Amino acid sequence: PVEMLTGMSQDLFGAQLTRTLTDSNVGTRFNIVNTRPTTLAFVELTDGQASYTFYDENSASRMITPTDLPALSPDITTLYFGGISLCNIPAADTYLALAERETSKCVIMLDPNIRPGFITNEAAYRTRLSAIFAVADIIKVSDEDLEWLIPGPADIMSKLAQLQAGRQAVMILTCGKDGARALLPDGTDVAVSVPPAVVVDTVGAGDTFNAGVLAHLHSGHSLTKAAIGQLRG
């Protein structure tokens, strides 16, 4: 079972989103419902690659604050954070507050999915990412994310190891057609290949990958903080 926690508008689009979530068996009991407008997102595809435009000023999802956060029920065991929700305040600081509040009880997975064009305050964003990295149990990045996080000539796996340093976290690197790599908490490097595929578009590809990781760990009874810390190659 999956629940969503976000700011949700009472407008037409918010009602449509809520119905779609319900039809997809995604719970909405933790959503913070308000009268602000729904964020609008537009996608343009070029050779299967997506570029995005968002209209998000004063939106229902962006304007939530830490005081809006609901208490989570004991059946919530894992929290997933990522994307542009971590870029702009007040929502970005609200999600950080949630992660820090729940890290002792819940597995935290983070996919920063860094989009430089949406970052309005780079220094604050880097500080926020460092704080949420510190409480995350699973961190998934792309090579583009790593290049932004750790600029310089070092090879990509060295940068992934640098990001893992001092953390008992599983680090996952997606490599497109070359599959994925992971550094386990003990430093073991695991590589997984993927079969060739014809790319139609990449919208939702990262989210689907992350859902697969969490579903696999859940099905193997490994989606707990203790089990993740003991993962071995």
Describe every region a protein language model picked out:
Residues 72-74, 132-133, 165:
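A short, aliphatic-rich alpha-helical micro-motif
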Residues 78, 83-161, 170, 178-179:
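Conserved beta-alpha-beta core of the PfkB/ribokinase-like small-molecule kinase fold
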Residues 152-233:
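Conserved phosphate-binding/catalytic region of the ribokinase-like
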Residues 3-81, 108:
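Conserved N-terminal subdomain of the carbohydrate kinase-like
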Residues 16, 41, 118, 148-149, ...:
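Phosphate- and divalent-cation-binding pockets in alpha/beta enzyme and binding domains
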Residues 69, 129, 199:
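Acidic, amphipathic alpha-helical patches
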Residues 1-3, 23, 161-165:
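A short, N-terminal amphipathic alpha-helix
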Residues 20-23, 46-49, 125-129, 156-159, ...:
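Short, hinge-like loop/turn segments at secondary-structure boundaries
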